[in-house]
Design a protein with these regions (language model features):
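P-loop NTPase switch/communication element
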Residues: 41-56
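NTP-binding/hydrolysis catalytic cores, primarily Walker-type P-loop NTPases
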Residues: 188-218
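Inter-motif core of Ras-like GTPase G domains
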Residues: 88-108
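Short beta-strand-centered segment that lines the nucleotide-binding/catalytic pocket of NTP-utilizing
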Residues: 29-44
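Conserved C-terminal guanine-recognition region of P-loop GTPase G domains, centered on the G4
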Residues: 112-132, 140
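Walker A (P-loop) phosphate-binding motif
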Residues: 1-28
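Beta-strand-loop-alpha "switch" segments that mediate conformational coupling across diverse proteins
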Residues: 143, 153-190
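Switch II (G3) loop of P-loop NTPases
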Residues: 71-90
Length: 218
């Protein structure tokens, strides 16, 4: 089973949005996908609950007594995580994932929070057995052609690990109500009218290529 983790302790950066869209994308490609919501807000579970039956099926992963009960035939597990996650829980989650995506919003506050989080993450990564987890960043909810858009691109494009390797910056997702409308209907943007979401689908391509390649695996 492959596990993809969406993590950034900063609230509202788009973790659940990215998690549900990735889950739907792989389910549409015929994979047996489970979506686990480690978040008490249960945004991903709420989304799953209203997902129309005729769309590609995604398994719900019940959280019982702090443990996730993942269906055994799962091929791809998507882990949506809460804001303000504490270190102990983060280490636990980091141990089981092969791939991690960090969404960041284009604001000075979010960039500073991401800097702090990445520092902590690098420390934790050394401590965890899973030092090989592949990480990528994405900029989310970006209003293009703004100074904030330039700043977030510049920041994400230049993040390096202590060994000098770059953390790949994989996508810029624009701010659009398409994500809001899709979420309201238990859908992904890949399940809305292509004419309306063409631009968004294009923006997802580099991230999806990365997820489909060995580069995103240890
Ligand atoms: N690219 C986008 N364009 C417009 N709205 C977006 C975009 N991405 C996310 N949103 C909206 O922003 C809000 C926050 O997104 P989301 O719930 O995915 O964030 P989160 O990181 O999971 O939040 P939390 O930390 O509270 O779990 C939601 O209303 C979502 O629909
Ligand atoms: Mg969430």
């Amino acid at each position: 089973m492959r596990t993809i983790l969406i993590l950034n302790p900063k609230g509202g950066c788009g973790k659940s949005t990215i998690a549900t869209n990735i889950a739907g994308y792989f389910a549409m490609r015929g994979k047996n996908v489970s979506l686990a919501d480690c978040d008490q807000q249960c945004s991903s579970n709420d989304w799953l609950a209203i997902r129309p039956e005729h769309l590609a099926r995604i398994n719900h992963v019940p959280l019982k007594k702090g443990r996730l009960h993942v269906p055994i035939d799962t091929e791809i597990l998507i882990l949506d995580t809460p804001a303000s996650i504490h270190d102990k829980k983060m280490v636990k989650i980091l141990r089981v994932a092969q791939t991690m995506i960090i969404p960041v919003l284009p604001s000075a506050i979010d960039i500073r929070a991401a800097e702090r989080f990445l520092k902590d993450l690098i420390k934790l990564r050394r401590k965890t057995v899973n030092n090989k987890i592949k990480i990528a960043t994405i900029a989310n909810r970006v209003n293009e052609m703004t100074i904030a858009a330039d700043k977030i691109e510049d920041y994400l494009d230049n993040i390096k690990l202590p060994n000098g390797r770059k953390i790949p910056y994989m996508a810029l997702l624009r701010a659009t109500q398409n994500y809001v409308h899709a979420a309201e209907q238990g859908k992904t943007i890949f399940e809305l009218a292509p004419s309306r979401t063409y631009y968004d689908r294009e923006q997802w391509k580099p991230l999806l290529r990365w997820l489909n390649s060995k580069r995103s695996l240890p």
